[in-house]
Amino acid sequence: MTGIHQLLMTNFAGGIATGEGQLNASGGNETQTIGIYKYHVFTSSGDFTVTGGGNARVLAIGGGGGGGHNASGGGAAGEVDDFQELLVFDNSTTYKVSIGTGTTNNGSQTTISAGGTNLVVSLGGGRGGNFSTAGNNGGSGGGGGAGPSAHTSGSSGGSASGDNTNAGGTGGPNDSPFAGGGGGGATQVGQNFANGASHTADSEQIGGAGGEGIALTAIDTNLAFANFSSFTEANSGIVASGGGAGSNR
């Protein structure tokens, strides 16, 4: 099909949306045509085979980072590349689509590549910090863990890199219940721990909330769950939210 192709790629429903230009291509776990747009949705890694070169726009989301353990920070969301850039896909070329996944460490990245060269890289989110450990850097940054000492701020959140990413929140002091910071999300930083009136063992510390994600329909109004069998109502169309932090009391 010629026209505007869109590639949507994420580990809940990944894919490629083909863009302006006379592109002929196949691939994806699901394809849908909505108006002048043809959407290639990748829910798992696979090939995107171009038989007639042209342009496409890509929505790609990296895998989410894992939470830490023991008074830990929340895991962060992966980077969201969101259809803004028009990419050129070469004639008679097979592109490898690798869908990033959540892990117990940093999330793995989502990529499109051919001949060993990456056309798209969406970074995975950073892992949340353990007790007395900073959150990992990533797409969005992981939340910092609690500690290392009483009456002071805890460990810092990881920094963010790439499009639609935010840093992780700071963890609390080394006081019960040892609360961590939230992981960064696509549209909001991870929140710092919340504490009571004073930094004492009796303070009611609360782990920081994860940063807010982004609605797919805010990127493209066609990306409603009703239009794609790969989408589910359960995710409410919100992607790349950061994870909330835990505590240890």
Where are the predicted features?
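Bulky hydrophobic/aromatic "packing anchor" residues in well-ordered structure
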Residues: F42, D81, I112, S122, ...
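Short, flexible beta-strand-to-coil junctions
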Residues: M1, N11, G62, A240-R249
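Short, intrinsically disordered, charge-balanced linker/junction segments flanking boundaries
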Residues: G15, Y37, H69, G154-A160, ...
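Acidic, glycine-rich loop-and-strand cores that form catalytic or ligand-binding grooves
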Residues: S159-R249
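Enriched but not universal
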Residues: M1-L59, F83-F89, K96, G116, ...
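Glycine-rich strand-loop-strand elements at beta-sheet edges
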Residues: I34-I36, V41-V50, I61-A114, G128-T133, ...
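Periodic beta-strand elements of RCC1/NHL beta-propellers and select beta-solenoids
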Residues: L59-G66, N118-G124, A240-G243
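Core domains of carbohydrate- and sulfate-ester-processing enzymes
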Residues: G129-G171
